[in-house]
């Protein structure tokens, strides 16, 4: 076996590009290696945030999303954007599980219940999605549409539900049918720590209209809760029912659509609608057609509107199918990112894939050791390059991100300087064996250590672009306008390998 000349991808976590040098630890640190690479090697900037990585417009990237997009070689839409996009494209309105549940209820003259976290928070749900579901039920002929509102106050200000409730009261008035039928704080409906006494409050409200209070409008019910000193999150079970209106308790044959997309706080209340349940004694158990917006747990036997999108032929899987060898290497802090997330949420190693883990230092905060374990990581990385064993090596250096998160500017500069020395050794090793190297980042962080708006410490990620640098013997010229999902196709192209059809990213080399 002749020694392999590896293609390496080095991900400098949290290493973004910002023109302004104020509080920019990357621009102000002494970085002779990176300076020389940018002066002499093919390089460009690529996008690592917002819709380019499947997040909402303008939202900063993060390590999980970044590595998923890099490894997938296509934009991987997060649930929020996937569902928003489906509504705009008209696909949501044709989703089989939703159509079937609504149409079955309409045919039998039964009710359609829509429930979920009623807020624009975008963490567990989005009220725009709930609005689309109400409109869809009305368009498909449902006469009885009951909206059960779980109130937020955690991902939104503590008393901010009124605007959302007013919006839906207005919508029902416009539709001429349906109503907000109940209110309860997420503290009850969305518990995730097996506090079944709380969940039972929500279950009894939904299935029996059993409530501490009844008001004739949602806004009035909320105002009364505020009078009692309850913020949105803690609003007690409240039935919304005017004089002469019938009860909105769930009945046999009704459709129930749960519009939360994040699983962790949706599981428990959903399990109360499954026959096999031991959390508490259910006074009633209506036989409803229940639809989960996404899969809340693999063992919940209910319909799913948006099943998990499995990622076929990610970079790692594709290399494995070509009989190639690959190494994933990082410190503890980012080990899951170069393995699990890079492989599209697959925990097991592919054939030909090896993993090396370097322990991150045991310090309270990384500003106390900004170089982290970069010396040991680099020794292992250089040895791997020179070993001749690997076709591809994926490596993540966590320093710029983990030290950036501390908000300590001097430490961030030291972290960048330690990184620069490490990159220098990796570049030398690659040149020595005649390999190829791409240097990039998954998102920004250390390039902005002070918030320019407030003047306060900035510890979060940024939505700025990240560098892409090539080192190797090919005459490479980069295209402009690239994004993280273009890296896998570009690497396959540099390695002379075929690109699978599932990878919709573009090759960034002209």
Curated annotation (Swiss-Prot):
The active site is at residue 63. Mn(2+) 2 binds at residues 13, 63, 442-443. Pathway: Carbohydrate degradation; glycolysis; pyruvate from D-glyceraldehyde 3-phosphate: step 3/5. It is an enzyme of class 5 (isomerase). It catalyses: (2R)-2-phosphoglycerate = (2R)-3-phosphoglycerate. Substrate binds at residues 124, 154-155, 186, 192, 262-265, 334. Binds 2 manganese ions per subunit. Pfam families: iPGM_N, Metalloenzyme. The keyword Isomerase applies. GO terms for cellular component: cytosol. InterPro entries: Alkaline_phosphatase_core_sf, BPG-indep_PGM_N, Metalloenzyme, PGAM_B_sf, Pgm_bpd_ind. Catalyzes the interconversion of 2-phosphoglycerate and 3-phosphoglycerate. HAMAP family: GpmI (MF_01038). Belongs to the BPG-independent phosphoglycerate mutase family. PANTHER family: 2,3-BISPHOSPHOGLYCERATE-INDEPENDENT PHOSPHOGLYCERATE MUTASE (PTHR31637:SF0). This is 2,3-bisphosphoglycerate-independent phosphoglycerate mutase. It comes from Vibrio vulnificus (strain CMCP6).
